[in-house]
């Protein structure tokens, strides 16, 4: 688990897994899942997140409007959508129409980390949580900046460079030393996976369920299901299929997320069950720093959900619903690991035998 290793070696005391339904969800689902885990541990009193804005008061004011949904704001949003605006643009204009004093901050909703930060704040509000939020200002390249050679280039730029097979030595000055060494070592050991590596599996899934449609899956409406079916004959790969399906009201990212919901069998029913369990029913430890071992002890004392340090032991300790959710996550992780093994012509890693990262 190179990501976990990079986090712990980079200074994280503890890394917990965000279950896959929320890890590949919208910003709202991602934030709700993350905040739910933190709240359930019983030991977290502060949440710090990065943002382009860097102003917690501005983000909190916007989050409160989005969370409470006052009628004038909702009516403006409804009217803007009827005019044919995409949802992000319609929401921004509705916000400014409701709160003109935010006009100087109209660009806040065009930045991904701001949007996620607002969702963290909404998640805290929804729980009436005592966790205190803070934000730090993002530095370096913008989230969507694909240029290399800038000071602290974006993750997108790094991923594209890896995909293109470029020499990565120049990244040493733009990444934390530990993270760079882990990336370099990992790439020497195996080829990484990209979205298009799942094209064949997705095409098979779409074909086998062609006649029944896809609207049982999370985030997929009957209209999108019909569009997928009608466009399926033009399928040549996952990425290009996203390009064919995207529209003014559905971004490439959202389409990609929907297709992975289909591939990984993530249904609306499953998401509703997760919500009924208040989003999270267990906390799985992926890695921790030796010096932070007392933190695990405190979580075990105070947590409202089981803390998993051994998958083998989880079968005896988890309630039936939680165990079912964990098993689904493991299966989906194995799908990823299986594709990784095929690409590298290696034996598939067994997640049950993968040790926790301890540094």
Predicted ranges, named:
Residues 1-3, 9:
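N-terminal catalytic cores of NTP/NDP-binding nucleotidyl/phosphoryl-transfer enzymes
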Residues 8-9, 147:
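Short glycine-biased active-site loop of nucleotidyltransferases that positions the nucleotide triphosphate
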Residues 13:
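Receiver (REC) domain switch/active-site residues of two-component response regulators
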Residues 18-359:
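Active-site cores that bind ATP or allylic diphosphates and position pyrophosphate for catalysis
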